[in-house]
Structures are given as structure tokens and as C-alpha cells.
């Protein structure tokens, strides 16, 4: 808690699709809302009152309210592919998060915000300026999302309390594979995958449009999201899975009844192959597009192989899943199996090429799934910000006033306060 006010720190994780916010020490975020803002249309007619200087800056909505007002307001996403792109909208978004949702006085709470890997130092400076000058917070810590996700995995029974591991963070807009050694991100080995939740939704929508003419066009994306979140899973073998559906359609294909939100007429649709074809994009991306062809298990293996040799064993042993797009049933099992195959094949080839002279030590591959996986980044931040040491490593308002925003270019790594 804040040594001065005795109040817990505020933890905000701004993702591409959703923002998670709440107070340190809690297991779950207090609010989860879309990272969307609806501002007054510049083309639309403004009332006489709103034309007064500055009033239009207050006329905006965020989250679900923004979506509800999307017909009369311009709706934008301030965060794209994990990076903040519109700082004016981001400041407005944080304003509503703090005052409307959390209903707190920012002067009384330390703040923990999250950032993607390889975030530009200038972005940290912009964040510091907004937090210290607009909100007048007493202290700020900007944590790397992957490190927080690694800490959150400690809740798993199979996890060791180590800050060495490989984090696969897959949300709505982007998927990162991030190796971490003793709390430090190995930046040169980070890899990005242009496949995430939004791409799976679009692919499922495309399949269902071709097969289900009953689905109203206006409903197709929401139905695709529902299928992705409620019915999808990862299969061990795509060819065998097609055979199961063809031989026993009544067992595997589900019929869903729904209602058109516009006409209120009922309609129904079948959920079939897309149940496993959506998540299959991670393991066989060529089924949707020829633009990107590298499966996730190969990216994970290549990432670890590009790291210093003395930390690779620990990176294979602790592969941690984070984000909503890793929540598919059996996602971890399939990933562990495929990565293990690559590792075992390489070891076998090494022995063959040495003529049997080199006997490699077996390498453990372990993929960690846990209960806090969906909101792992926020939960890791909640754990960190609830420790007394957290307040010792935060950048304070006094330091900011003395030195300036450049103090936030660097943050003490979580490993230093473990």
C-alpha cells in the first residue's frame, strides 16, 4: 500500500482488444472493457454548447459504451498491435478508467502500467508525462508484460518460482514469443507472429459465411467470436479430426439457435469444422493465407535456439502461456508435443552426425498452463504491486519534477525485487 495514504496501487493493463484494471492484491481485475474510444464525429453537426472551446474534448465514451454509441460517434482503438498509436485518445481513455470506473483520486495511489516488449523509450516518456502531469500520481512503474506473465505462472502446481522462461503472449491483436533470463528480456531473440485472436475470428467468420447463408451479415463477426470463445479447441491431428466429423456428424456438429438483433427474426446455424480450424492457424497458418507460413512451435523453437546457449535449457523447461488466445482447450498439450518433436529430432540428428560419439542429455520441454492465464499480465502486476518492495522501485513525482520524463526510460527489473 501507498506508504503515505495506505491505499493499494492501481494496476492497468491496456491490451489491443481489452483493458484490464483494478487494485493491487486482488486476484481478478475490477473491470475488463474493450480498448475502444468513441469521440465526437468531426463531420457531424455539433450542438451550440459543444462548439464552445474545450467542451468537445469531454464528449467521448470508452469500452462498451463506445461500442453502443458507434453509430453517432467516431470509434477508434488507441492501441494497435500492442503499441499506443494515439496519445490524445489514450489520455482520454485513462481519464475515464481512473475517474469513471475505478473512481479513485490518482494523487493517492501509485500506478503500475504495462508495456509490450521492445517498447520505444519515447513511449515510456509520453506515458510518464501523462501520468505525472495530467493525473499527478505520486509514483509510477511501467512493467514489461511478459515478465508479469512469467510471475503469474507461479500459481501453477507445475511451475517453479523462477524468472527464467519463454512467454507466449497471444491476445487479440498480436502474438509475441519472449525469452526471459533471470527477469531480463532477451530483446534480440523476441519474435512476433502476425496471428492472434482477431485473425482467428476473421477466419472463422470467412468459413461460416461460405457455408451458412442463414447468418445475417451484421451478425457474422459476433457469431464468429462466440464460436471461437465457446466451442473451439485444438486438435492433435487435423486430418483425423476431419474424419471424425465426417463419420459422426451428429456427435460433433452443433446446431445453434439465435435471433437477428435488427429484425428480431430467429435463425439457426451449424458449428462444425471451424471449431478446430480456427485455432489450427497457430499450427498450420497456410490454411488461411500464404502471407505467413511459420507454425508457432517452430517460432518458439527458433526463438530459444537464438538465445545464449547457457540459458536454453531453462527456457525450454518453462514455456508459459499468457493471454486469451492461448485459452483454447489442449493448446498447451499440442504446443508441448510439437516443440518436443523438434527438440528430439535435433538431438537425434546430432548423435547421428557424430557417429554415435556424442550422447546428448535429454532436454525437458514443459508448457505451463494455469488458472490465471487469461489475465496473466494483470494478475502478475497485481502480485508485484502488492509487495512492499514495489514502492522502492517506482519512479516518484519528486524524481520526475527534478529530472524529467527521461527517468522512465529505464525501470528496475522485477527480478530485483523478487
Swiss-Prot record:
Where in or outside the cell is it found?
Answer: Cytoplasm, Cytoskeleton; Cytoplasm, Cytosol; Cytoplasm, Cell cortex; Cell projection, Pseudopodium
- N-acetylmethionine carried by residues: 1
GO MF terms on file? actin filament binding; ATP binding
Up-regulation conditions: By starvation.
Q: Which UniProt keywords apply?
A: Acetylation, Actin-binding, ATP-binding, Cell projection, Cytoplasm, Cytoskeleton, Nucleotide-binding, Stress response
Chief site of localization:
cytoplasm
Annotated PROSITE patterns: ACTINS_ACT_LIKE (PS01132)
Which GO biological-process labels does this protein carry?
Answer: actin filament polymerization; actin nucleation; Arp2/3 complex-mediated actin nucleation; exocytosis; phagocytosis; response to bacterium; response to mercury ion
Pfam families reported for this sequence: Actin (PF00022)
| Listed GO CC annotations | actin cytoskeleton; Arp2/3 protein complex; cell leading edge; cell pole; cell projection; clathrin-coated pit; cortical actin cytoskeleton; cytosol
Q: Which PANTHER family match?
A: ACTIN
Instruction: Give the record's subunit note.
Output: Component of the Arp2/3 complex composed of arpB/Arp2, arpC/Arp3, arcA/p41-arc, arcB/p34-arc, arcC/p21-arc, arcD/p20-arc and arcE/p16-arc. Interacts with carmil (via the region between the LRR domain and COOH-terminal proline-rich domain); carmil is required for Arp2/3-dependent actin nucleation. Arp2/3 complex, MyoB, MyoC, and the alpha and beta subunits of capping protein all form a larger complex with carmil.
Q: Member of which family?
A: Belongs to the actin family. ARP3 subfamily.
Function, as annotated, reads: Functions as ATP-binding component of the Arp2/3 complex which is involved in regulation of actin polymerization and together with an activating nucleation-promoting factor (NPF) mediates the formation of branched actin networks. Seems to contact the pointed end of the daughter actin filament. The Arp2/3 complex is involved in organizing the actin system in cell motility and chemotaxis, in phagocytosis and macropinocytosis, at late steps of endosome processing, and in mitosis.
Q: What is this protein called?
A: Actin-related protein 3
Source organism of the structure: Dictyostelium discoideum (Social amoeba)
Gene symbol here is arpC
Amino acid at each position: 500500500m501507498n506508504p503515505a495514504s495506505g491505499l493499494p496501487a492501481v494496476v492497468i493493463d491496456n491490451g489491443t482488444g481489452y483493458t484490464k484494471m483494478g487494485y493491487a492484491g486482488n486476484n481478478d481485475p475490477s473491470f475488463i472493457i474493450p480498448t475502444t474510444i468513441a469521440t465526437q464525429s468531426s463531420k457531424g453537426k455539433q450542438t451550440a454548447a459543444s462548439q464552445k472551446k474545450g467542451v468537445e474534448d469531454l464528449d467521448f465514451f470508452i469500452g462498451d459504451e463506445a461500442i453502443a454509441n458507434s453509430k453517432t460517434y467516431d470509434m477508434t482503438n488507441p492501441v494497435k498491435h500492442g503499441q499506443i498509436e494515439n496519445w490524445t485518445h489514450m489520455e482520454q481513455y485513462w481519464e475515464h478508467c481512473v475517474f469513471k470506473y475505478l473512481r479513485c483520486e490518482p494523487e493517492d495511489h501509485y500506478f503500475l502500467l504495462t508495456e509490450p516488449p521492445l517498447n520505444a523509450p519515447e513511449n515510456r516518456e509520453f506515458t510518464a508525462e501523462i501520468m505525472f502531469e495530467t493525473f499527478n500520481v505520486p509514483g509510477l512503474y511501467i512493467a514489461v508484460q511478459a515478465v508479469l506473465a512469467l510471475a503469474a505462472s507461479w500459481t501453477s502446481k507445475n511451475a517453479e518460482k523462477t524468472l527464467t522462461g519463454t512467454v507466449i503472449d497471444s491476445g487479440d491483436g498480436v502474438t509475441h514469443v519472449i525469452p526471459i533470463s533471470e527477469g531480463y528480456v532477451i530483446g534480440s531473440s523476441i519474435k512476433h507472429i502476425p496471428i492472434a485472436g482477431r485473425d482467428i475470428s476473421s477466419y472463422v467468420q470467412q468459413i461460416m459465411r461460405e457455408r451458412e447463408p442463414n447468418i445475417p451479415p451484421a451478425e457474422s463477426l459476433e457469431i464468429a467470436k462466440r464460436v471461437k470463445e465457446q466451442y473451439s479447441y485444438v486438435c492433435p491431428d487435423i486430418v483425423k479430426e476431419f474424419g471424425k466429423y465426417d463419420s459422426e456428424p451428429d456427435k460433433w456438429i452443433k446446431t445453434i439457435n439465435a435471433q437477428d438483433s435488427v429484425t428480431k427474426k430467429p435463425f439457426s446455424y451449424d458449428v462444425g469444422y471451424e471449431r478446430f480450424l480456427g485455432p489450427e492457424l497457430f499450427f498450420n497458418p497456410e490454411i488461411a493465407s500464404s502471407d505467413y507460413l511459420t507454425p508457432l512451435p517452430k517460432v518458439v523453437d527458433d526463438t530459444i535456439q537464438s538465445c545464449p546457449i547457457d540459458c536454453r535449457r531453462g527456457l525450454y523447461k518453462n514455456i508459459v502461456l499468457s493471454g486469451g488466445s492461448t485459452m483454447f482447450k489442449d493448446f498447451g498439450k499440442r504446443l508441448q508435443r510439437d516443440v518436443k518433436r523438434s527438440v528430439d529430432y535435433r538431438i537425434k540428428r546430432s548423435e547421428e552426425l557424430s557417429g554415435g560419439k556424442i550422447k546428448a542429455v535429454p532436454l525437458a520441454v514443459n508448457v505451463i498452463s494455469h488458472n490465471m492465464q487469461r489475465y496473466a499480465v494483470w494478475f502478475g502486476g497485481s502480485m508485484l504491486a502488492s509487495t512492499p518492495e514495489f514502492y522502492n522501485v517506482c519512479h516518484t513525482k519528486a524524481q520526475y519534477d527534478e529530472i524529467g520524463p527521461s527517468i522512465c526510460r529505464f525501470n528496475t527489473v522485477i527480478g530485483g525485487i523478487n
